[in-house]
A protein has these predicted regions:
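N-terminal lobe of the biotin/lipoate ligase/transferase fold
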Residues: 1-104
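Catalytic beta-strand/loop module used to bind and position nucleotide/cofactor moieties
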Residues: 90-134
Length: 134
């Protein structure tokens, strides 16, 4: 898929995985981080089985209850980036945009997602900080 950006043409590569392991998905996300060529944007779409994902600097015991998670079959994973603790399951679709800094634009990337949803007949809106609601 090709688009345009203020810096010129952009190639959009969409990668969707069927894996639901948070460890495989976060590992692939980390690998893809270094793979965007100049002028290329990678959109990575993925889902996890029930998992709490915490940020690089978070304390597991301050953010969640590991014993209860184990009883409920909820996995725990840590991403290499910062940010808060989030719950993932098969009811949400995670997306990661990967691009060199000249092409990186959160508002632009969210608009790509909204336009794609609209083409599928799914209304959506930007809500909160970097979130989409459908």
């Amino acid at each position: 898929m090709r688009g345009t950006s203020p810096g010129g043409p952009t190639d959009l590569v969409v990668i969707r995985t069927a894996h639901t392991s948070p460890y495989e998905n976060l590992g692939l996300e980390q690998y893809l981080t270094g793979q965007a060529a100049p002028g290329q944007c990678i959109l990575y779409l993925w889902q996890n089985r029930p998992t709490v994902v915490i940020g690089r600097n978070q304390n597991v015991w301050a953010e969640c209850r590991p014993e209860a998670m184990e009883e409920d079959g909820v996995l725990l994973a840590r991403r290499l980036s910062g940010g808060g603790a989030v719950y993932h399951d098969l009811g949400n679709l995670n997306f990661t945009f990967i691009a060199r800094s000249a092409l990186y634009s959160v508002p632009r990337h969210l608009e790509v997602i909204l336009k794609s949803l609209s083409l599928l007949g799914i209304p959506g809106e930007i809500s909160g900080r970097n979130d989409l609601t459908v």
